[in-house]
Design a protein with these regions (language model features):
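Extracellular glycoside hydrolase catalytic/binding regions
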Residues: 1-116
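Non-catalytic accessory regions flanking glycosidase/transglycosidase catalytic cores in CAZymes
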Residues: 119-127
Length: 127
């Protein structure tokens, strides 16, 4: 198939996965069969069961680079979930942020997430 040939001709494999940790791990193990470095260039969607605490340990276990889409709440509106097209969050924020990690004032959306990210990346506490 075309998809198989694309992967086989690639030096690295980049992919997106917004699913739960079990699905993420299944995707990773299937891609590892091609024996290429793996780059997960989008992975975090809290309301879809894809979280830092669920995804990053799997990525670390298999040495997969993981890039988060969204850092600070802002104009790109990546706090909004996919259903915001059907249910605009005009007068209230979504109950669960989709991507971003920090509010515009620099405070974390979830201190537990930030602590976890520091822990798993070996960054420790800020100076």
């Amino acid at each position: 198939t075309v998809a198989r040939e694309q992967v086989e001709l690639s030096d690295v494999i980049s992919f997106h996965n917004y699913d739960n940790p079990r699905s993420f791990e299944s995707r990773v193990t299937s891609l590892l069969l091609y024996r290429r470095p793996l780059l997960c260039t989008e992975y975090m969607a809290r309301s879809n069961g894809s979280t830092f605490q669920g995804t990053l340990p799997v990525a670390k276990k298999y040495n997969v680079a993981a890039f988060n889409w969204g850092l600070v709440e802002g104009k790109t509106q990546t706090t909004l979930p996919w259903d915001s097209w059907q249910h605009p969050y005009i007068d209230h924020p979504p109950p669960i942020w989709f991507h971003d990690i920090f509010r515009t004032n620099g405070t974390p959306y979830s201190a537990d997430e930030v602590d976890f990210i520091r822990s798993i990346t070996g960054r420790g506490t800020p100076q």
